[in-house]
Swiss-Prot record:
This is Protein-glutamate methylesterase/protein-glutamine glutaminase 4. CDD domains: CheB_Rec, REC_CheB-like. Residues 15-132 form the Response regulatory domain. Its main location: cytoplasm. SMART domains: REC. Residues 162-348 form the CheB-type methylesterase domain. Contains a C-terminal catalytic domain, and an N-terminal region which modulates catalytic activity. Pfam families: CheB_methylest, Response_reg. Phosphorylated by CheA. Phosphorylation of the N-terminal regulatory domain activates the methylesterase activity. Belongs to the CheB family. Involved in chemotaxis. Part of a chemotaxis signal transduction system that modulates chemotaxis in response to various stimuli. Catalyzes the demethylation of specific methylglutamate residues introduced into the chemoreceptors (methyl-accepting chemotaxis proteins or MCP) by CheR. Also mediates the irreversible deamidation of specific glutamine residues to glutamic acid. It comes from Anaeromyxobacter dehalogenans (strain 2CP-C). Its EC number is 3.1.1.61, 3.5.1.44. It is found in: Cytoplasm.
Length: 356
């Protein structure tokens, strides 16, 4: 007798370990994550020592990790995870200067994303939507260390750059982007074209990120404010939770900072920035799309290329997550895909051609 087709297997749920010294945060995360049918919380731990045993016993697919904990700090534990049992890690941090600095250090150490603890400025409802999305994206992306890079060489400024203030470089990134952007800017000279950056990152963390870029690159990097001019040697970073657009104002470019709905599930959105650059700067722009999950920025980069801008993508081998550049390449938005350490020289080469 024919028993008919076997019933389809349910998709495997994402196994998550929550590590936080706050019992309240552990309970909230467990409750909110467990409410999603695609996620299973396989354990919670108050410190890295308890977490270590659970990692070995229960093999989580994703770990949420508080960076400020007793007994062993989250950064030290993150290094151990990446060395001995690489696992996608979402760093959870308080909105404080110390927490922001630690979160950026964690991203540099291999964490795939960062988010804020719920509080007065960040409701549990907002946190839940972000947390579930980040867990699913982290599980899909997996963990992958970027290719090792040589120390950056600061390139010489092409002579043509000094003769123009009309050029602008737009850089968009997500997962792995904080390190990639830092490497690019560290290799650019003080006279490089003005740069606008959209990096997917929560509110307030972008301020710490901009400060880190300033300290590490020597360029005048800061979190953008509406009406600021984009001039050579400056780097304006889109503030978290708000979109950044470029517009022409006479002979110069200025940025607009706007609220509004998320685009491609993100605010700030790379697509929003790239599309505005296409309209405002056209052939005077260079667009760069870097490592990151999803497809934000691909359509906007295509709009830039269609408007005459030069476009570059980070190649697969040097990406932490080859998502955003991959979609951009598939859309025909990219002129050249390059290893991370060749992107800064390419920016200067293209700027020199345009200024010559």
């Amino acid at each position: 007798m024919d028993a008919g087709p076997a019933p389809a297997r349910e998709p495997r749920r994402i196994r998550v370990l929550v590590v936080d010294d706050s019992a309240v945060v552990r309970n909230v995360f467990q409750q909110e994550l467990s409410a999603d049918p695609g996620i299973e919380v396989v354990g919670t731990a108050p410190d890295p020592f308890a977490a270590r045993d659970l990692i070995l016993e229960r093999a989580p697919d994703v770990i949420t990790l508080d960076v400020e904990m007793p007994r062993m700090d989250g950064i030290t534990f993150l290094h151990k995870i990446m060395r001995y049992r690489p696992t996608p890690v979402i760093v959870v941090s308080s909105l404080t200067p110390a927490g922001g600095a630690l979160a950026l250090e964690a991203l540099a150490a291999g964490a795939c994303d960062v988010m804020c603890k719920p509080g007065a400025a960040y409701s549990v409802g907002e946190m839940t939507a972000d947390l579930v999305e980040k867990v699913k994206e982290a599980a899909a992306a997996g963990v992958r260390a970027p290719a090792p890079l040589p120390p950056p060489d600061r390139a010489a400024t092409p002579r043509a750059l000094a003769r123009t203030t009309l050029q602008v470089v737009a850089i968009g990134a997500s997962t792995g982007g904080t390190v990639a952007i830092e490497r690019i800017l560290a290799a650019l000279p003080p006279g490089a074209p003005g740069i606008v950056v959209t990096q997917h990152m929560p509110e307030l963390f972008t301020r710490y990120f901009a400060n880190r870029l300033r300290d590490r690159s020597g360029l005048d990097a800061r979190e953008a404010q509406g009406g600021e001019s984009v001039v050579p040697g400056t780097v304006l970073v889109a503030p978290g939770s708000r979109h950044m657009l470029l517009r022409r104002s006479g002979a110069r470019y200025v940025v607009e900072i706007k609220d509004g709905p998320r685009v491609n599930r993100h605010r700030p959105s790379v697509d929003v920035m790239f599309r505005s650059v296409a309209r405002a700067a056209g052939p005077n722009a260079i667009g760069v799309i870097l490592t990151g999950m999803g497809g934000d920025g691909a359509q906007g980069l295509r709009a830039m290329r269609d408007a005459g801008a030069r476009t570059v993508a980070q190649d697969e081998a040097s990406c932490v997550v080859y998502g955003m550049p991959k979609v951009a390449v598939e859309l025909g938005a990219v002129e050249r895909s390059l290893p991370l350490d060749r992107i800064a020289p390419e920016i200067l080469r293209l700027a020199g051609e345009a200024g010559g």
